[in-house]
A protein has these predicted regions:
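FAD/FMN-dependent oxidoreductases across multiple families
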Residues: 66, 229-311, 315-317
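C-terminal helical "tail/cap" subdomain of flavin- and related membrane-associated enzymes
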Residues: 313-398
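Predominantly flavin-linked oxidoreductase catalytic cores and closely associated redox partners
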Residues: 112-249
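A conserved beta-strand/loop capping segment in the N-terminal third of enzymes
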Residues: 56-107
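Conserved N-terminal glycine-rich FAD pyrophosphate-binding loop of Rossmann-like flavoproteins
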Residues: 35-55
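Glycine-rich FAD pyrophosphate-binding loop
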Residues: 22-42
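Residue-level detector of alpha-helix initiation sites
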Residues: 11-12, 36-37, 104
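Beta1/beta-strand and adjacent pyrophosphate-binding region of the FAD-binding site
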Residues: 1-13
């Protein structure tokens, strides 16, 4: 039987929207190229604002049972080696972020989707959208060696930053000056391990650390794509040299052992234009990508899924699935994340001026209450408008 909704991509965004629509009684087919459990290149950090969304999806208890690390806030070290700390704190109450492997998180979300009645098909490689005039009515893809088409009333693309559907429909808009490449892996025996997300600024980008278990640390290196190309080094050699040449990390990694393959993603920095075709929506990274220094990809995934599910429910009930009818989701998405995009762009500009980055971090180190506000924005529970104001800028810069 033809599904009401075809969701492409079973990451957090795809699994979340599938859960929400299945609860409304729709027949949902969720297709994924990989098989589970599967890993992803990700900082593996869930901001405090993710917690109520995970509870809404019915997976919070399962995630807490998986023993995630509870992060108290974030630390940022500037180019000179000076650090500022910001806590996850709101109205005097301490909050926390969660960190756990995507291998675990994605599997728990997909299991919940299946419990809600979602049909899951793994190993299905989507090749292109299926078009009926100006309407996207499904996808054509491949399962093992067999070509196949799948039709649905509504297609929701949750197929990530390299979205096949966005590219095939000509909707990808590259942000060339923000192109980065990310390398991610896990290390054991990093000393000391900190209950914080940590960011270390380096001339070409930054290094991120976050504990994901009692013994493992997620280590991410994010660099400008042009810088990586100019080094002419292999990914493995570049990653190892970048970590080992940082003064603090060289000491903390003296006994460390890499315990996972090095994962790579990028170049990344793009937005997806509002579809002109009927019958399709884009969520998560497929709808546009923040630089991970300020963006919180998993929160974006879950929140955009919530926005999309509400619009999709109204559209499916009324049968109004044209591009104009679905545009309300695009506008809601833009309202929800526009200021975070603006802040991301400003921070990336600042990171290209070490003197400015050093000045800001020095001020935040001297005024911890301001650092708490910045970290609250990164944690998705303080509005980006707070730090985009002239008043806040003068407090940090003057």
């Amino acid at each position: 039987m033809e599904p009401d909704v075809l969701v492409v991509g079973a990451g957090p965004a795809g699994a979340a929207v599938s859960i929400l629509l299945a609860r409304q009684g729709y027949r949902v087919l969720l297709v994924e190229r990989a098989t589970f459990p599967r890993d992803k290149a990700c900082a593996e950090y869930l901001s405090p604002a993710c917690t109520p969304l995970l509870a809404q999806l019915g997976v919070l208890n399962a995630i807490l049972a998986a023993a995630p690390q509870r992060l108290q806030g974030m630390r940022v070290m500037d180019y000179r080696g000076r650090s500022c700390w910001g806590r996850f704190i709101q109205d005097g109450q301490c909050l926390y972020g969660l960190a756990l492997p995507r291998l675990v998180l994605d599997h728990l979300l997909v299991e919940q989707a299946c419990r809600e009645g979602v049909e899951l098909r793994t190993g299905f490689w989507v090749r292109q959208p299926l078009l009926d005039g100006q309407r996207v009515c499904g996808v054509s893809g491949q399962q093992a060696q067999y070509r196949e088409t799948v039709r649905a009333r509504l297609v929701i693309a949750a197929d990530g930053v390299q979205s096949t559907l966005a590219r095939r429909l000509g909707l990808v808009r590259r942000i060339h000056w923000l192109q980065h490449v990310a390398f991610v892996t896990h290390y054991a025996s990093v000393h000391p391990m900190q209950p914080w997300g940590e960011m270390f600024l380096i001339p070409s980008g930054y290094i991120g650390l976050a504990p994901v278990s009692d013994t493992l640390v997620n280590v991410s290196v994010v660099v400008r794509a042009a810088h990586l190309a100019a080094t002419q080094k292999t990914s493995q050699a570049f990653f190892a040299q970048t970590v080992q040449t940082h003064p603090e990390l060289r000491q903390r990694f003296a006994q460390a052992i890499r315990v996972k393959n090095l994962l790579t993603t990028g170049p990344m920095a793009q937005r997806t234009a509002c579809p002109q075709q009927d019958g399709i929506m884009f969520i998560g990274d497929a709808a546009g990508f923040f630089d991970p220094f300020t963006g919180q990809g998993i929160y974006l995934a879950l929140h955009s899924a919530t926005l999309a599910a509400a619009v999709a429910h109204r559209a499916l009930c009324s049968g109004a699935l044209s591009a104009d009818d679905l545009r309300s989701y695009f506008l809601a998405h833009r309202r929800a994340f526009r200021d975070k995009y603006r802040l991301s762009a400003l921070i990336q500009l600042g990171l290209r001026m070490p003197w400015l980055a050093n000045r800001v971090i020095d001020r935040l180190a001297r005024r911890p209450s301001l650092a708490d506000i910045v970290v609250g924005v990164a944690g998705d529970f303080v509005s980006p408008k707070t730090v985009l104001s002239w008043r806040f800028a003068t407090q940090v810069l003057l």
